[in-house]
């Protein structure tokens, strides 16, 4: 019987303990941070997957599907390649003297004049594209003794046989083709680009009919360079009804230099020069439509925003563009470590601090306070610590963009078959650069994410230490991010703790008295629920055992009779 009384006393004593915050003479204050039900996984240096409350995607993986016409000046090549427009193919006459920032070549572009080849096509195309203009100046070359302005049925202007408008086809006059020696000085202050060519007849008869001599020769010289080309007579695959060809060459004449042209036949002469400008214009092959919009960055797939530091839309770009990487996604943490709030808090539903979990629903700040006191419960954000974290995180994205956005363009590389090894080397270099940047991007983002998480954890710890130093012995650290305050602390008192104006000395005596007046054993919150349930179960079990023993003893003494009927 004494055992029953003792256990009952313990049982009642345990349940009689006053819950934190329910006693008018105490209060509970917890510190916590923002949490969301479903966070975002990011990568850090130490963890491949860590959940944060918020993250920003750093890789632009889609385009607008169209090329914006602003702020760059876009010139749509339509049916013309840049070289056809340069030479003056009849169906490209509309491009004469045009200017551009980006010349867009279409896959449907075609040549519609005399068949030609350019031995150094890529260099000429790149040179003219970067110049950004087809401005042409005619010059008065003196071609005495030959017939000028030859034409062909394969190159019609309207219904008339014609030729490239920027070139002058010279052939025999009265069965004569004298030796040609023509000079043209550059008295300007800019570089001049001269385009000229050599005609390769398909037969010896065609050669003599046009140029009298059985073999021609063309030499073009400046003080710095000399090119000599001997025609190759012979049949070639038929193109637009012709098996003969023209080879296109080009010469740059510097200011103060002289252009010298010497020929005994087969010369396709220049009519003048193109002004060469130094600039950042370029060319791009694309079939994306040109639209009325604005974008600094253009790819063959279309324009893309440049508000992200990386993109994997296309390696070829023009303008201020994000750096190309292989990854489809790289997420930058812009929030703190996410620890979703527990839905239940034991049998008491008690509040808990940041050590155990975050708080959902705290929309006005990243860090804050929850309290229980005689006036009820409440929650408020700490704006100062929130702002300190936000200020440091906000600049991360802008800094990444500044580090990675290219202020130049990555143009297409073209090489002839003879330059195959150079092309392979160029491809290897470009692929290596992309691999390095992809690795660097992943490492950079992981470092920034690690710093963000460490930073936000640090701000939480700073706020906790600041609160602990204010309360001192007036409160006890409960070990879960909460303090049990041993004096009456109304909402005004709680507010003073939050804003840093709490006066420890005012409450010191009351707190000390309340500490000593607490009765019974105060169990730690982490084990209280378990101990209460275990105590209750043991008490019930022992009570049943004692009751059963009493019944059996009474039956033996005859004080109780038990009849079992079947």
Curated annotation (Swiss-Prot):
Question: What are its GO biological-process terms?
Answer: clathrin-dependent endocytosis of virus by host cell; fusion of virus membrane with host endosome membrane; fusion of virus membrane with host plasma membrane; viral budding from plasma membrane; virion attachment to host cell
The record lists the membrane-crossing segments as 531-551
Protein modification: Palmitoylated.
Q: Where in the cell is it found?
A: Virion membrane; Host apical cell membrane
One GO cellular-component annotation of the UniProt record comes to: membrane
Topological domain spans for side Extracellular: 17-530
Primary location recorded for the protein, binned into one broad class: virion
Covalent lipid attachment of type S-palmitoyl cysteine occurs at 555, 562, 565
* Residues spanning the signal sequence: 1-16
Q: Membrane topology type, per the record?
A: Single-pass type I membrane protein
* Disulfide bridges in this chain: 30-482, 68-293, 80-92, 113-155, 297-321, 489-493
Record's InterPro entries?
Capsid_hemagglutn (IPR008980), Hemagglutn_HA1_a/b_dom_sf (IPR013828), Hemagglutn_influenz_A (IPR000149), Hemagglutn_influenz_A/B (IPR001364)
- Glycosylation site positions: 24, 38, 54, 79, 142, 181, 301, 499
Q: What family is it from?
A: Belongs to the influenza viruses hemagglutinin family.
Further information in the entry reads: Major glycoprotein, comprises over 80% of the envelope proteins present in virus particle. The extent of infection into host organism is determined by HA. Influenza viruses bud from the apical surface of polarized epithelial cells (e.g. bronchial epithelial cells) into lumen of lungs and are therefore usually pneumotropic. The reason is that HA is cleaved by tryptase clara which is restricted to lungs. However, HAs of H5 and H7 pantropic avian viruses subtypes can be cleaved by furin and subtilisin-type enzymes, allowing the virus to grow in other organs than lungs.
Subunit record text = Homotrimer of disulfide-linked HA1-HA2.
This protein is called what?
A: Hemagglutinin
Naturally occurring in which organism (per UniProt): Influenza A virus (strain A/Hong Kong/5/1983 H3N2)
State the gene name recorded for this protein: HA
